[in-house]
């Protein structure tokens, strides 16, 4: 008899839900699909800690990089709410500022594990642990974010499923 593992829900977080977290959501979904693991997830989503870009499509550079790599991205910005801490198993931030903001609003006793996406870095020198905000940077910064997020997504799937 095979025991079926419970499905999990994952939310990716950045400041505005405009550059990094929508990219993370899209890449993670892409990697889940490639690995044929859709049946292991209830929800995969992304949010911002702020309301700067609620209802907006992601930054055009995020969309461009995803499309160049064959990753579908279709998202409108949303802000994380306290209720989400009981709807998701993992709430994953891109940098320390995201984690600090999340911990300020996380209700005591909620089920979500708040963690840094870089926690899945194997520290073998492939990528840096912190996914820096590319907002003020150029397209190479978005490309590097793509590399980091792809790497962390693959590591998450290896270690958590």
From Swiss-Prot:
Its EC number is 3.1.3.48, 3.1.3.2. The active site is at 14 (nucleophile), 20 (transition state stabilizer), 133 (proton donor). It catalyses: O-phospho-L-tyrosyl-[protein] + H2O = L-tyrosyl-[protein] + phosphate; a phosphate monoester + H2O = an alcohol + phosphate. Present with 3500 molecules/cell in log phase SD medium. Acts on tyrosine phosphorylated proteins, low-MW aryl phosphates and natural and synthetic acyl phosphates. It comes from the Eukaryota. Keywords: Cytoplasm, Hydrolase, Phosphoprotein, Protein phosphatase. Belongs to the low molecular weight phosphotyrosine protein phosphatase family. It holds the Pfam family LMWPc. This is Low molecular weight phosphotyrosine protein phosphatase. The record marks 21 as: Important for catalytic activity. The lineage of its organism: Eukaryota, Fungi, Dikarya, Ascomycota, Saccharomycotina. SUPFAM superfamilies: Phosphotyrosine protein phosphatases I. InterPro entries: LMW_PTPase (IPR050438), Ptyr_pPase (IPR023485), Ptyr_pPase_sf (IPR036196), Tyr_phospatase_low_mol_wt (IPR017867). PANTHER family: LOW MOLECULAR WEIGHT PHOSPHOTYROSINE PROTEIN PHOSPHATASE, LOW MOLECULAR WEIGHT PROTEIN TYROSINE PHOSPHATASE.
